[in-house]
Amino acid sequence: MEGHVIVPLEKLSLELNNGGIMLNHDKDISALQEEISALRSRQRHLDHRRQEALDKLIDLKGSIRVFCRVRPSISANNFMTKSPVTVENEKIVVRAVGIKKEFSVDRVFDQESTQEDVFQEVKPILRSALDGHNVCILAYGQTGTGKTYTMEGNNGKLGIVPRAIQELFSHASQDSSSTYSFSISMLEVYMGTVRDLLTPRQPLFRSTECNTSSIISILATKSGAVEVEGLTDVAIQDLKKANQWYCRGRRARSTSWTNVNDVSSRSHCLTRITIKRSSGGTTEECSKLWLVDLGGSERLLKTGASGLTMDEGKAINLSLSALGDVIAALRRKRSHVPYRNSKLTQILSDSLGDGSKVLMVVHISPSDDDIGETVCSLSFAKRARSIESSKELSEDIKKLKQKRIAELDKEICDAEQELKDLNEQIKRAETSLEERKKLSSSACQALSDEKGSPRSTLVVVGHIDSAESPQATEKTKSRASHGSVPHFMSPTVCSRQRHSSASHSATKTRLTKSVNRYPAAELSGSHSFSYSSCKNAAKARSVAFSSSMPKMKCLPLKSDQINMSNNSIDSTAASAPRRRESFISRPAQRAPLHQHRRRMSSLT
């Protein structure tokens, strides 16, 4: 392969760029990186637009929304009699003897509504929690109306809490523009005392004196954020772990038997999901999602409670009244909000105020026996919603409102679909980028391995004339000649210079002798000859010599083309001093180590 440039046999296209070689893979990698950067910029823009539309939608519907869910009839006799509760889309009418009351709410779920129907209305507010807003979802109502069923579910019919946790993890796995981390905490407010439900299990019996190790305190920062000191906060990496910790906490909740409910909650159960979100180089956002299963409002005469159970009922009613005061003050935008009237409202203070989203699901019973409790629960909902039935919006305004809500819903759906498509494009681009990087890394490794490796697979991609680069040819041949010679036996720079000058002198001498062999008649005319003729003759002798000595390798002769006259040749031959003949070091003809003319002392 003498006189050629050799490169690794790879499917690589090379081009000279500013005097260097640049792989086309690098261009592909740069193009893919620019494409991913543009896609992520578009993704952030769409996500910001979706957040704005969602905030407008929630504000239009109301930052504090009140739903009502009617429990299915339990007694067989109730199916035969007409229920006193009549349900419309946003209105509930309660009829009794000589009484008819109407209550307006944001949405009514009748007796045939499913867990999925309820959760679909909860989904938008969960997106606000992922966007960085504090969110609070509460289940309120009389004992035995299905609050715990709505929040927890049973028999495979998941409630709001497990569905919300599942939705959070599902969205986090699909959103490639942000990184999410979640943690869970559970506590209960039992008779004005806060208990941690994720600590080691407490004794099964209820006591008015709680364990000192489970007492935690509530602290408020200058910015208004609430910190529950001493509360267990468990990081959850997947849905399975989250469900395990949630089941552990709800099993530790205080319950008791009453005349109304066999398993009556005797406390307020609060589940907190802390969401931390980081998007690129921006600062980390932290938000809280509170899922609250409130204790049942009850009348002592109906429940038949006494002793400790009666005290628990009183504590529940007091905290529910304080919660109603807080929500009413917030809806009316009063300057003072009485958060400190209850442990419950004190804990939820930063998730009920400005910038937060609140959703309350009020539960009622369709039974005639529960008309009194139904009216009380709906009055609480009316107070929280702070809208009088006589001051309902006109039909035209309602239509405009519904039209605007539909437009915002469509805008959110379009943005979410486009975000989904962008996520797929980003994933494909990132996959291609990884493949290009691996291919480029493999190519660079192959080039590094083949450098100086004579056994590498090589291919000729170009030809270089030896006359144009004699130094490169000489170096290549020199490395080939001395590749197997030990370092201390290889020729030095001075010896190579002597070899070169001696070879040049010997060439001139052979040329002089060859000229003297020609007759004088052949030199008549110009009395000169070109160096190329002599060079051809020298090549012929070199070929003959190489055939007799196949293992010997000589360096190529390098000389400019010379025109010499007969007289100059004679004078040069006569005046040239006799030099000691020198040969190139050859592995096949090198002298034994003890006869080498270099001093061995220089090796130590």
Swiss-Prot record:
SMART domains: KISc. GO terms for biological process: microtubule-based movement; spindle assembly. Disulfide bonds: none annotated. Residues 593-604 have a biased composition (Basic residues). The keyword Nucleotide-binding applies. Pfam families: Kinesin. ATP binds at G141, Q142, T143, G144, T145, G146, K147, T148. Residues 465-511, 565-604 are annotated as: Disordered. Residues 22-61, 383-443 form a coiled coil. Keywords: ATP-binding, Coiled coil, Microtubule, Motor protein, Nucleotide-binding. GO terms for molecular function: ATP binding; ATP hydrolysis activity; microtubule binding; microtubule motor activity. Residues 565-574 have a biased composition (Polar residues). The keyword Nucleotide-binding applies. Residues 63-387 form the Kinesin motor domain. GO terms for cellular component: cytoplasm; kinesin complex; microtubule. SUPFAM superfamilies: P-loop containing nucleoside triphosphate hydrolases. Belongs to the TRAFAC class myosin-kinesin ATPase superfamily. Kinesin family. KIN-14 subfamily. This is Kinesin-like protein KIN-14O.
